[in-house]
UniProtKB/Swiss-Prot annotation:
Species annotation: Idiomarina loihiensis (strain ATCC BAA-735 / DSM 15497 / L2-TR)
GO cellular component: bacterial-type flagellum basal body, distal rod, P ring; outer membrane-bounded periplasmic space
Assigned keywords, A-Z: Bacterial flagellum, Periplasm, Signal
Protein's UniProt name: Flagellar P-ring protein
InterPro entries: Flag_FlgI
Length: 366
């Protein structure tokens, strides 16, 4: 029985050692410098709309240019009715290492006064990068998740967004973007969230596998790694490195407050220094009424209109709670819930604690 207990204890200790706390793969917390997607954008026309198009000047100009490319010229003094056409902006993400001939998804958005893009087809549109070069061409039928309808009396109902659609695999890559992946003796990992401790641990993890001096933490974001020159070896090398697990550093104490929605997110390491808080909720209601005094019939008088304001003030009794040294997140939440504070009250309390120097964390209001 004693041997069985010792074996069970050993198994439990091994399981604890085999599961590092907050260990993440390098590929999940960092990216390789230069290996990224690129944004593409273009301008084009959607045709075939069921009367939900537009008659804007730039749509008319684009429509004339398109017909001119096919040898059809419209007199300048004539303006054709084209309510089945809409001018659109087309954008897409060009993935890293995308090759010519591969297909990408594109998003189409109306830039004019079109009521909807349902049932439309995007005409051939060039997608350009930030340097003005064409990297892809988009074309195809739109998939629109929104719906819009309008009655004869002007009433209208809109579900979701009918002026934005997508074309899965609607773009064809025409040009490759060079990444510089194999042009240097070094590769650099950039952490998604900068942290000196995590960068140091990443470099140590790589050095423990490959050898001392292979990886070097440059700053809180970047870790530079020596890599093989041969491309086939470099791919295998990066595949091994990106699957290494690194124990991330504990996050800094932060409190994120969204004043518009009342959302409050409190980090685990937030603590409070000794403080006492009293907060009372005051509600002020102002109502404006108008009194109309009419003169008696056949009397020589005028109607008098006098405004009347009614102001009502309701204030709850202030409640006080005390934070002792070492108060943690759980204590803070429990104390606030006990007094029944609303999100707006909680935000006011947090701001006051920060100003008083009793909050050991960064308060960020978004």
């Amino acid at each position: 029985m004693r041997t069985l207990k010792i074996f069970a204890l050993a198994v439990s200790l091994l399981s604890m050692l085999a599961a590092p706390v907050q260990a993440s793969r390098i590929k999940d917390i960092a990216s390789v410098q230069g290996v990224r997607s690129n944004q593409l954008i273009g301008y084009g026309l959607v045709v075939g709309l069921p009367g939900t198009g537009e008659q804007t000047p730039f749509t008319d100009q684009t429509f004339r240019t398109m017909l001119g490319n096919f040898g059809i010229n419209i007199p300048a003094n004539e303006r054709p009715k084209i309510d089945n056409v809409a001018a659109v902006a087309v954008h897409a993400e060009l993935p890293a290492f995308a090759k010519p001939g591969q297909k990408i998804d594109v998003t189409v958005s109306s830039v004019g006064s079109a009521d909807g893009l349902t049932g439309g087809t995007l005409m051939q549109t060039f997608l350009k990068g930030a340097n003005g070069e064409v990297y892809a061409v988009a074309q195809g039928s739109l998939i629109v998740g929104g719906l819009g309808a309008e009655g004869n009396d002007g009433s209208r109902i809109v579900i979701n967004t009918p002026t934005v659609g997508r074309i899965p695999n609607g773009g064809v890559v025409e040009r490759e973007v060079r990444s510089g992946f194999g042009s240097s003796d070094y590769l650099t990992f950039n952490l998604h969230q900068s942290d000196f401790t995590t960068a140091k641990r990443m470099a140590e993890t790589i050095n423990n596998l490959v050898g001392d001096g292979t990886a070097q933490a440059v700053d809180a974001t970047s870790v530079r790694v020596r890599a093989p020159r041969d491309l086939s070896q470099r791919v295998s090398y990066m595949s091994t490195l990106e699957n290494l697990e690194v124990q991330q550093a504990s996050a800094s104490a932060k409190i994120i407050v969204n004043a518009r929605t009342g959302t409050i997110v409190v980090g685990q390491n937030v603590e409070l220094r000794p403080a006492a808080v009293a907060h009372g909720n005051m509600q002020v209601t102002i109502a404006e009424n108008v009194n109309v005094d009419q003169p008696n019939p056949f009397a020589d008088g005028e109607t008098a209109i006098t405004p009347q304001s009614i102001i009502d003030v309701n204030q709850e009794d202030a409640r006080m709670f005390v934070f002792q040294p070492g108060t943690t997140l759980n204590d803070l939440v429990r104390a606030v819930n006990q007094i029944g504070a609303a999100p707006g009250d909680m935000i006011a309390v947090l701001e006051a604690l920060k100003q008083a120097g009793a909050l050991s964390g960064e308060l960020i209001v978004i």
